[in-house]
Amino acid sequence: LSIHGEKNFPFRKVPSDLDIGLPDGTDDRRYLRELADALDAVSAFRPDLVLYLSGVDPLRSDKLGRLDLTFEGLMERDRMVFEFCRRRGMPVSIAIGGGYADPITDSVEAYANTFRVAREAFRG
């Protein structure tokens, strides 16, 4: 599964099993709706391990991301992914990526939020 800015780098994308290219300026609501639909489709794959690249370049203040997500939207994205994995007993490995916000502290805060949300989701 890859959810990404359709017109963003790399311009020639290697296809994945499920690609969702979003238009420039996509907001929280549209992004999260697309993610919910995609997670339904991922259920059919039944992966043994989820490799989650929690990119923060969709953040509104990111200079290169071209999407328009808020901190809250990114946190909800993470929550949806982690809850999806937890409920299905799927182990998840988290990597961070992107992060070209101005100010850069926005990227740092978004990275930290991913791990805060993971801690909440997997706290036993």
Where are these regions (language model features)?
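A general "terminal functional-core" signal
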Residues: 1-124
